[in-house]
């Protein structure tokens, strides 16, 4: 028996309600899908995936299915309820509450979120399931600050796929766009069985990296540009040519262009233009070091086979563990040195006054700060 309380999310195919379950004696989420909005095959696929993920040993960071019902008009999936909603809305609130002079009171444990998200993805892949729609809107947050990966409606029980229009455009891997595969795949009456396959796990790795970028900066790496002939990621060619210069232009330069000049200390200007306050990422240098790790391990363009979530996790663990075991002042200076070395881009697309060579690098050890 369920008592619907209120709608908490409405999408193209389904509406999700918060409800009280007398059977489970807890709040639950009812995902109600009208039968005319989806096929029986699609719903069966989602049900089968959720049944596997919600087996006798469900993963703590995956939103489990508690029950399932159907009648003449609707499919009703009973899911775990997460009190704090999704990360997209949560960060939107944090962004509106915070500013350089009055930072947000909401703090998010970035290290925990990354590890839990990677653990959930790895668990699903170990069961032969790829999510195919990883994004902040599908990451739910509990009252304890833990995450649960949700909405497995696009999931597939296969490491390979030739579906090129699955997922959310801003987070989709480049190989899943029609503009980056053979145009013959999209001709009318084309036999999809002969279309080239992409690796669904490696596509998930890309989406993971794009999602973490959004969590750090509140802005997607790319936006999608569409036309009748081609669909592609806007500015993607710039990223493919030089990802570090692209990230510098997109995320660093805007934070330097708000009234700062050549003489302004880059260290100060970056620190004062932080967008979010992370519990375990106390400064912008940690954030941009994480950017480099993601580019090196997750956001590979030309060869998706080089993407590795295992390498990403190992490098992140190494960076955090190294910092925690070192003297804080020495560690902080190392991070500044690393930032200067990695992000000293010199490209004509970056105005000269925003290039690192025109800023004085802080020397905390020498100055005794």
Swiss-Prot record:
GO cellular component: mitochondrion
List of residues binding ATP: 8-16, 31
Keyword Nucleotide-binding attached: yes
InterPro entries: Kinase-like_dom_sf (IPR011009), Prot_kinase_dom (IPR000719), Ser/Thr_kinase_AS (IPR008271)
Pfam families reported for this sequence: Pkinase
Induction: By treatment with 8-methoxypsoralen and UVA irradiation.
Catalytic activity: L-seryl-[protein] + ATP = O-phospho-L-seryl-[protein] + ADP + H(+); L-threonyl-[protein] + ATP = O-phospho-L-threonyl-[protein] + ADP + H(+)
Protein kinase domain mapped to chain residues: 2-369
Keyword Nucleotide-binding in record: yes
Keyword vocabulary terms for this entry: ATP-binding, Kinase, Mitochondrion, Nucleotide-binding, Serine/threonine-protein kinase, Transferase
EC number(s) recorded for this UniProt protein: 2.7.11.1
UniProt cross-references to PANTHER family, sorted A to Z: OVARIAN-SPECIFIC SERINE/THREONINE-PROTEIN KINASE LOK-RELATED, PHOSPHORYLASE KINASE
Homology family: Belongs to the protein kinase superfamily. Ser/Thr protein kinase family.
More info: Present with 339 molecules/cell in log phase SD medium.
Protein name as it appears in the record: Probable serine/threonine-protein kinase FMP48
Annotated source species: Saccharomyces cerevisiae (strain ATCC 204508 / S288c)
């Amino acid at each position: 028996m369920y008592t619907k309380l209120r709608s908490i999310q409405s999408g193209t195919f389904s509406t999700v309600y918060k409800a009280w379950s007398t059977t489970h004696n807890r709040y639950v989420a009812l995902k109600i899908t009208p039968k005319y909005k989806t096929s029986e095959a699609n719903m069966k696929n989602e049900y089968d995936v959720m049944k596997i993920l919600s087996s006798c040993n469900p993963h703590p960071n995956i939103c489990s299915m508690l029950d399932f019902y159907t009648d003449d008009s609707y499919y009703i999936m009973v899911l775990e309820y997460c009190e704090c909603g999704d990360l997209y809305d949560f960060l939107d609130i944090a962004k509106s509450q915070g500013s350089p002079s009055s930072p947000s009171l909401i703090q998010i444990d970035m290290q925990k979120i990354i590890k839990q998200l990677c653990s959930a993805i790895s668990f699903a892949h170990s069961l032969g399931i790829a999510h195919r729609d990883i994004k902040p809107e599908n990451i739910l947050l509990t009252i304890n600050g833990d995450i649960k990966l949700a909405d497995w409606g696009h999931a597939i029980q296969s490491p390979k796929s030739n579906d090129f229009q699955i997922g959310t455009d801003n987070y989709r891997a480049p190989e899943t766009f029609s503009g980056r595969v053979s145009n013959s795949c999209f001709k009318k009456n084309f036999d999809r069985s002969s279309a080239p396959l992409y690796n669904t796990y490696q596509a998930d790795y890309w989406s993971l990296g794009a999602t973490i970028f959004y969590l750090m900066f509140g802005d997607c790496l790319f936006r999608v540009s569409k036309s009748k002939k081609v669909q592609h990621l806007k500015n993607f060619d710039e990223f493919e040519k030089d990802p570090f210069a692209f990230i510098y232009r997109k995320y660093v330069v805007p934070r330097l262009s708000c009234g700062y000049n050549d003489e302004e200390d880059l260290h100060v200007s970056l620190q004062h233009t932080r967008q979010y306050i992370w519990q375990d990422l106390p400064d912008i240098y940690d954030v941009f070091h994480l950017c480099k790790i993601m580019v090196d391990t997750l956001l590979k363009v030309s060869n998706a086979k080089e993407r590795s979530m295992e390498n990403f996790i190992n490098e992140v663990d190494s960076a955090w563990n190294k910092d925690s075991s070192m003297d804080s002042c020495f560690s902080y200076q190392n991070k500044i040195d690393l930032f200067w070395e990695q992000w000293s881009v010199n490209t004509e697309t970056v105005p000269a006054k925003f290039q690192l060579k025109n800023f004085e690098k802080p020397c905390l050890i020498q100055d005794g700060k």
